[in-house]
Structures are given as C-alpha cells and as structure tokens.
Design a protein with these regions (language model features):
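Charged, amphipathic alpha-helical regulatory modules used
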Residues: 1-99, 516
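Catalytic-loop motifs flanking and including active-site residues across diverse enzymes
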Residues: 14, 18, 226, 522-529
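A structural signal for well-ordered alpha-helices, especially hydrophobic packing surfaces
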Residues: 68, 491, 530-533, 561
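Conserved catalytic cores of very large enzyme subunits
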Residues: 92-518, 539, 543-691
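Contiguous, well-ordered alpha-helical segments that form the cores/surfaces of helical PPI scaffolds
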Residues: 232, 522-535, 555
Length: 691
C-alpha cells in the first residue's frame, strides 16, 4: 500500500518507520517505550491507498495524547524539526534542477546573480527563515514603540499584500542603499571598516583599496552603493603621481617595464582593474555582483556641489583634468562594453539646465548626446539648481533638505568641509504600498456606502458604474493617508531597529563616517499607478484627468512625508522598479479577485504602460515631466525604449525637450546583441552576426 509524502512523491507504507518515530519520541521524552504500546498504536492506525504521511502523523499524535501527553509533545516537536529539514531538502533538489538562479529562487530572485552554484544555494536556503526573523524583530519593535494592535496590523498589511517590505529575505538589521562620501577613505584607508590597509598614497593603491572599499560597504547594505566622488578622487591620485599637467603627457611612456605603457594606457588599465573587479561575483553577497553607481558632472554642477571641497593635503579638485577624465572614462567604458558584458557601474550624468529648454554647459550637453549616439547606455539627471543630486538608481534628494535635517549637526564630522550633504545619503528601508489594491478597496467602500454592488475582477467601466469624482477621490485620499501614516510608523520602528545595531557597533560604515544615518531616507514606495487609474476608467496618457489623478495620490503621500518628518526620520516617495514586486502584486491581486489589466502580467512602474505603442518618446517625457513627478523624490526614471540609436543632433533635441518638460531623470534603451556562437557584442539590434 502506497502513502503520499509532503513533496508529492509516493512510497510503500512502512510500519517500521512509524514505530521508529514513536520510539524516538519516547527517547526524547526520557521514557521507556513498551512493545505492547507500540504495537497497539500502529495496529490502530487506519491506513488506506494514497494516504498522506501528514494524516498518519495526525493519527499517531491523537493516540499518544490519550496515552502519554509528554511523549505526544516530543513526537510533535520531532516531526516539526524534521518537517523543516525535509522542506529544505526538497528545496535543494528543486534548486539543483532549476535552469538558473532566478527560477530556482522561491522568495526573492536577484537579477545580479548570473550563475547557479553552491554559494547561491546557500544564500537561497535560509531566505524563508530570514523573512520570518525580520518580521518577528520588526513586529516586536512596533509593539514596544506603539501597540500590539499596530504590530498585528503590520503583519496583516503584509499578508493581505497591500504592503510590501523590500528585501525582507536578507539578514536582519541591514539598511537598504547608500551613497557614501569617500573622505574617511582618504584619511584612514579601510582601518575603520575592519581592514588593515592605510590610506591610499598613489593611483595603484587607490584602485586596489577602492575595490575593497566598495565590497566592504556593500556587504552591510541590501542594495546599491554609490560613489559619486570616484573619478574626482582618481584624478587627485593621477595628479599626485604624474603632475598637475598630466594632460600634456598622456602619450609619454611612464611605465618602464617591458610593456612600456604610456600614461593614457596606465589610466585605462586602472579603469579596467576597477570595473572588471566590480563586475565579479561577491562571495559575501551570495555571489551577487555589487550594485555600484557613479556620477558625472558638468562644470556648473560640479562647482555647485564640490566648490568648497578640499582634499586632506589642502588642495582642491581641478576641473580641467577631472573633465577630461570623466569623458575619457565614458569613452573607454563604452568601448569596453563591446568586448565584455559589463553591468556596473550604473552611470548618471548630472547636467544643469538654464531653467528653460537648454543647458548651462553646452559642451557637456553636446558630449552627453554624443555618447548616446555612440551607443552608450547611462542615465541623465537634470536640475535647474545644483542643490539636488541623483546619487543612486532610485534616490533623488534635495541637498538643502539634507542640510536642514539637522541644523545643529556639525557637517564637517561627516561631510569634511564640502559644505553639502551631496553624496552622503541613501535609503534605509523601502516599504511599498499596493496602489491598485488600495484604490480598488477605496472605490468598493465608496460604492458600498451607496448600496451599489461591485463585482470581483471587473473595473468600473466594465460594470457601467458612475461616480462623483470629488467624493471618490476623497475616499482614495483618506485610505492612502491612513496607509502612509502606518508605513511611517513601521519605518520609524525599523529605523530604531538599525539604530540598535548601530549602537552595538554592528554597522561599521556609519561609525567610520562614510554616511550619517540621519541623512538617509525612509522610503514609501509606489507601484502600479497606471493600473489604479485604468480601474477607474481613466485613460493613461498626457491628459488633465490622468494628471489630476496622479497628483491627488502623490501629493497626499508627500504631505504626510513632510508632516511626519523628525530629527531622526526623513521620509520620501519613490516609484519602485518592477523587479519582483510588480509581478507578485499583480498575481496576488488577480488571485484575490481584484481587477488586473489583461494587457500585461505585472503592474507598471512608470507613468505610462510600457506596451502602449501609441505614445511617442515626447509624450513619455511629458508624462515623466514636472507636472507628474513634482511630488516624487526618486525612482521616476524614464526608460525610453528605441528601436535603433539616433544621431547626436536628435539626442540633443530630445534633451532639450526633457529640460522643457522638467523630465529630470531619463535614459534611452536600445537592445544590444550578443552572438551565442562567437560572443561578438554589438550596440545594435541584429538578427544575424556580422562576423
């Protein structure tokens, strides 16, 4: 007679296995197991073809309860332990048989993992436990700070999928992402991060220690690490090694080894050392690569951000050499990507606009268009004031807000005479609200209060429902206000949790001065705004009705963020990238009877629907322009997908359109092609390899 195991497999029923389990329970309880009792329990079981092993265990538990409760408890505990072990064994088997690391992951697949191996398995194996532990720690903190009721509400929000906590699967106590100041690195090297290296003294030691710095910092954060000063510091060491006039000696032979390298080749080798090292899997991150971001600046932006900066020796950055190095690195990196598939660094070009439809630094605006026309892929961040900076793929912050966050704080402690908090920022935690679910629940309440029935799985137009816009929007605002308020409390509790780790000396990056915790945000994530609009029958596109709907939601969150801001907690709002969240929320909502769009299988993370081919690039720039993004703090990057690369003049014109619309964060995407046979990489979308 066959029994069915928990993993679906079948095997022959074994009386001996059942007896062994009962004997083990008696042994655990410290009592003697009589053969007559053993036979009585096993003979009394009702076994039939295909019975589940869990049902057999239930019958044994009942029998033991009537005989010896102490042994019954031991039997239950033993089986619970074995159940977890069996579950992990099944997972290992499934993971080994998966096609890649992403499909093998059950809880939080990561795009930065390219290979499936024993290291990635080890990372995946305990994600479920980490999620449970993270929830236990945070609910305990919420209960102590607020109430048991709010702690239970947090779990209910997660369970009902109206709330999503990003990166719950990591080790408890990890902050999210960071843009560091590298100044402590210039003074102390890696000593304060537990290393033995002293401060770098030349270009060679700078590159080697910088790689270790980024890996060390990234090991204490779940997400990205941005180093906006990277090229400025590299230029400093090149000038120290080869003189202030090194641009006049780029073709001079400076390497006296048999290679006889010129200065420009030495610089290229330094680029290669750093970039290729950053694209290697990191053992301390479960074989992920580090998510590394850098920034470029035009001249007025650079002067606005780093105008008062001084190196430890009292010297100041030199724009002429830095400008050449920035441009040379972009050119080199673009060419290097024709030889290797290199994801990092994620680059952002920061340009200052003239407040209208053009740029203050015409040279850098032209160069930016030139790089796009040559097939390079990078972000562009626009501002009419150098008081804001996009330092990371998600975060856009106001430097004035950061400075004013703690007026009594001595900025020189962590900012080292820079006069701004431009690079020392980040997000400590991201919690995202499920907008489509929230809006549909609010609409249901609106119609219920008017005794109008709402069918599951249908949007408002499909049901022929009509509504008073002002009254319905009030329901939506009230629900979003309540949700935002709860998220702020949850995030404040998380903030206290990582402060506990900081006080215990567990977060070296903060203690070493690379980042001030009070300069990091607690982020309210937003996803699925187009799906929420479509549920109400609002056409997604550049029109007044959609703009009003968007601003109603985002302004409500923004007001709450400013209202709840404290000395230790600053809140911001971001459009979170699709990643896992957009697909998970879509599937969960569909399963629970909510309306989801039949045109896609995940929620949109933009202000438009990616599959909508009727929208032009100009319209998408309008939708990601100031009229729509003014209440957002980050994550609103426009990814303009193109079939083929444009000319320099065409890209330059699009940049002017972006400036005129206030589209402050954007990039252009063209599919690259990699030949599966010879490995040839093309910046163009090809059907046939030219080699």
């Amino acid at each position: 007679m066959e029994v069915r195991k928990s993993n679906g497999a079948r095997e022959e029923f074994s009386r001996d296995k059942v007896k062994n389990g009962i004997c083990e329970a008696y042994k655990t309880a410290g009592e003697k197991c009589e053969d007559v009792i053993l036979d009585s329990i096993v003979n009394g079981l009702f076994i039939y073809e295909g019975i589940a092993t869990s049902e057999i265990r239930r019958q044994v538990e009942e029998a033991l309860m009537s005989i010896n409760k102490k042994v019954a408890k031991a039997y239950i505990e033993n089986n619970d332990d074995n159940k977890d072990l069996r579950k992990k064994q099944d997972f290992i088997t499934e993971y080994i048989n998966a096609s890649n690391a992403a499909t093998g992951s059950k809880f939080d697949s990561n795009a930065n993992v390219t290979n499936k191996n024993i290291v990635t398995l080890g990372q995946e194996l305990y994600k479920e436990n980490n999620i449970k532990q993270n929830r236990y720690i945070l609910t305990d903190k919420i209960r102590k700070m607020y109430s048991k009721k709010l702690a239970e509400q947090y779990l209910e929000d997660l369970k009902s999928h109206v709330l999503y906590k990003h990166d719950e699967s990591g080790t408890p106590g990890y902050p999210y992402c960071v843009a560091i100041t590298m100044y402590p690195f210039l003074e102390d090297g890696l000593k304060k991060l537990g290393g033995v290296s002293v401060a770098p003294t030349d270009l060679k030691s700078f590159c080697g220690e910088f790689i270790n710095l980024v890996y060390s910092v990234s090991s204490q954060f779940m997400g990205a690490v941005a180093t906006p000063e990277f090229l400025m510091y590299m230029d400093y060491f090149i000038r120290k090694d080869y003189g202030e006039d090194y641009l006049d000696h780029l073709d001079d032979v400076v390497d006296l080894t048999s290679k006889r390298r010129t200065l420009v080749k030495v610089i290229d080798n330094a680029f290669q050392q750093v970039v290729h090292s950053m694209n290697m899997p990191a053992g301390n991150r479960g074989y992920q690569t580090v998510f590394w971001n850098i920034s470029y600046f035009d001249k007025p932006y650079f002067e606005g951000v780093f105008g008062d900066f001084k190196f430890p020796d009292g010297s100041k950055p030199k724009w002429e050499t830095l400008s050449w190095l920035q441009k040379h690195f972009m050119k080199w990196f673009n060419k290097e990507r024709e030889k290797y598939i290199l994801t990092f660094p994620v680059e952002t070009m920061a340009l200052l606009t003239n407040g209208g439809n053009d740029f203050v630094d015409q040279d850098y605006a032209d160069f930016t268009a030139e790089m796009w026309s040559e097939g390079h892929s990078f972000f562009c961040y626009l501002s009419d004031s150098p008081d804001s900076l996009s330092s990371c793929c998600r975060l856009r912050n106001s430097l004035k807000d950061l400075d004013n966050a703690d007026e009594d704080h001595n900025h020189t402690t962590h900012q080292y005479s820079m006069g701004t908090a431009s690079v020392s920022t980040g997000s400590k935690s991201v919690m995202s609200m499920n907008l489509p679910r929230l809006v549909q629940d609010a609409a249901r309440s609106y119609f219920d209060d008017r005794d109008i029935s709402v069918e599951d799985g249908k949007n408002v137009p499909e049901q022929g429902l009509t509504y008073d816009k002002e009254e319905l929007y009030k329901y939506i605002r009230d629900d979003i206000r309540e949700m935002t308020s709860r998220i702020h409390k949850y995030q404040t509790a998380f903030n206290e949790t990582i402060k506990d780790f900081l006080k215990a000396g567990m977060l070296d990056v903060y203690n070493a001065g690379f980042i001030d915790m009070r300069k990091q945000y607690l982020t309210v994530g937003v996803n699925g705004i187009t799906d929420a609009a479509e549920f109400l029958g609002i056409k997604v596109g550049p029109n007044e009705e959609y703009r009003e709907f968007v601003n109603n939601i985002l302004e409500t969150i923004n007001i709450e963020n400013r209202k709840d801001k404290t000395r230790d907690c600053m809140f911001n709002t971001e459009f979170v990238p699709a990643e896992n969240l957009a697909a998970k929320n879509y599937k969960w909502d569909q399963k629970d009877g909510y309306w989801v769009s039949p045109n896609r299988n995940l929620y949109s993370s933009y202000f438009y629907n990616p599959e909508d081919t009727s929208l032009s690039v100009l319209q998408k720039m309008e939708l990601h322009g100031n009229e729509y993004v003014k209440y957002l703090d980050g994550g609103s990057a426009l990814h303009a997908n193109l079939h083929e690369h444009l000319s320099k003049a065409q890209y330059r014109q699009l940049m002017n359109v972006a400036a005129a619309n206030g589209c402050n964060y954007f990039t252009f995407n063209v599919k690259n092609t990699v030949c599966n046979d010879c490995g040839y990489i093309s910046k163009h979308t090809l059907d046939k390899c030219p080699h």
